[in-house]
Amino acid sequence: MEKQKILDQIKGGLIVSCQALEHEPLYTKEGGIMPLMAKAAAQSGAVGIRANTVRDITQIKEVVALPVIGIIKKDYEGTPMYITVTMKEVDALVACGVDIVAVQGTGARRPDGSSAPEFIRAVKEKYPQQLVMADCATLEEGIACAEAGLILWVLRCVATHRRQKDATISIMHLSMNFPKNALQRSLQRDISITRNRQKKRWKREHSLW
């Protein structure tokens, strides 16, 4: 699918995350459940799917014609990063034909010492035609990733580690206490890229751009 067609299709719509990790009830070794979740989302009007692992992405793309945002979650020693952390994960996602590669765009360093913007530049250099999305938690992170060449970002409550209950104060404040409209508006003023939000909705209007 062409890049502009993907962007036009997901603009202003609902992207549904269809993921299950090994310790979660909907996970099975053979897969097959996430594609059903994706089909249900598509039938209900979703404009895109976010999925984890090459297996689930491949199975989902076989049953729905929606753009798929792909990630690979993996813990690495010495870094709190866990969402598409290295080029190895990016290579696997691109090889399976994912429409958008999502990487963690928060402030921690990757195992090789690179920052999120540095990693994004490396990805864009290796795969110049690939759409890449960054998971950001602060205004500064969003701007830095945009300056690295992104045209997509997702505002998430990204903890510093998926097993860590306490993230930074600012992230927990965003996650637990109020809708993230103010941060989103700040990003919209400072950078001109496509925006996406994930999780925490108090009212319908909180999901509107």
What are these regions (language model features)?
Residues 48-53, 57, 69-71, 99-104, ...:
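Short beta-strand segments at enzyme active-site cores
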Residues 43, 63, 95, 125, ...:
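Residues at the C-terminal ends
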Residues 36-50, 96-97:
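Catalytic domains of carbohydrate-active enzymes, especially glycoside hydrolases
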Residues 19-21, 43, 72-77, 96-110, ...:
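Glycine-rich phosphate-binding active-site loops on the catalytic face of alpha/beta enzymes
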Residues 78-96, 137-151, 184, 188, ...:
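Catalytic cores of alpha/beta
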Residues 2, 26-29, 50-69, 80-88, ...:
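Active-site-adjacent beta->alpha loops and helix N-cap segments on the catalytic face
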